[in-house]
Amino acid sequence: MGRVTERRKVIRIRDGAVSTRPDTLVAEEPLEIRLNGKPLAITMRTPGDDFALAAGFLVSEGVLGEADELQNIVYCAGATVDGSNTYNVVDVRTAPGVVLPDITLERNVYTTSSCGLCGKASLDAVRTTARWTIDDTPPVRLEPELLASLPDRLRAAQRVFDRTGGLHAAALFTEEGELVDIREDVGRHNAVDKLVGRALQSGSLPLSRTVLLVSGRASFELAQKAVMAGIPVLAAVSAPSSLAVDLAAESGLTLVGFLRGASMNVYAGEHRIALRAAAAQG
């Protein structure tokens, strides 16, 4: 299996002085995901948790939703010039009797951090393929101070980022702010898929009383993945896209952006944020 990091020579220029030294870089390799032997998608990812990534991707596509729908996931043969396995192709086998959505069977996709359809078609696709509505009855209720503390907890748990400075992260927290799981990857979407895939494998879906925190911005794709996993709250340290806000509003997802220090913007689902308490303190 590929390594999470690799070493490369770098020429460093600092205060006019030039030096050569080895540097630790985050690894990036393609992963082909097959469904019952048929090619489905290719994503650029950081090696590691590949089976969880594939499972989470299929949850996001509306293909899987229950642990018993998954028979197994295996690496396929894919040799390098020296004959060793590249571990860059995985095949997801569904359990006998599982009926697959027709739209996924012959679809070949190259996924990136900004993949997805456009506008209303994207919103409709999520609505028609989602396994669950977001149902956190009684609603998750979060104090702004708790939300504000999460980015520091995320950063403290980023082990590979400390060595490379080049990874995104996604983390699941309980409504009390306890860290449930964290994954790192060169792509935020992959990090989320790894979280969701592990939840599928452990039979924990839907994630109805959790908070998903992502480094960087909140794209439509990340909002889609949250909705498809039944996550009620998505928070990001940077801005959301307009389509992410539209999806959140339509799906009942709480969407928080610019979560930095003691400030944040709430774009949708404000009923889960204790706004009155925050106003009283201000």
UniProtKB/Swiss-Prot annotation:
InterPro entries in the cross-refs: Cytidine_deaminase-like (IPR016193), FdhD (IPR003786)
Subcellular location: Cytoplasm
Keywords: Cytoplasm, Molybdenum cofactor biosynthesis
Gene3D superfamilies xrefs: 3.10.20.10, Cytidine Deaminase, domain 2
GO molecular function: sulfur carrier activity; sulfurtransferase activity
UniProt key word Cytoplasm: yes
Entry's Gene Ontology cellular component terms: cytoplasm
Residues annotated as the enzyme's active site: C115 (cysteine persulfide intermediate)
GO biological process, alphabetically ordered: Mo-molybdopterin cofactor biosynthetic process
Pfam families in the cross-refs: FdhD-NarQ (PF02634)
Task of the protein: Required for formate dehydrogenase (FDH) activity. Acts as a sulfur carrier protein that transfers sulfur from IscS to the molybdenum cofactor prior to its insertion into FDH.
Family: Belongs to the FdhD family.
UniProt-listed HAMAP family: FdhD (MF_00187)
PANTHER family: FORMATE DEHYDROGENASE, SULFUR CARRIER PROTEIN FDHD
Name of the protein described by the UniProt record: Sulfur carrier protein FdhD
Organism of provenance: Streptomyces avermitilis (strain ATCC 31267 / DSM 46492 / JCM 5070 / NBRC 14893 / NCIMB 12804 / NRRL 8165 / MA-4680)
Gene for this chain: fdhD
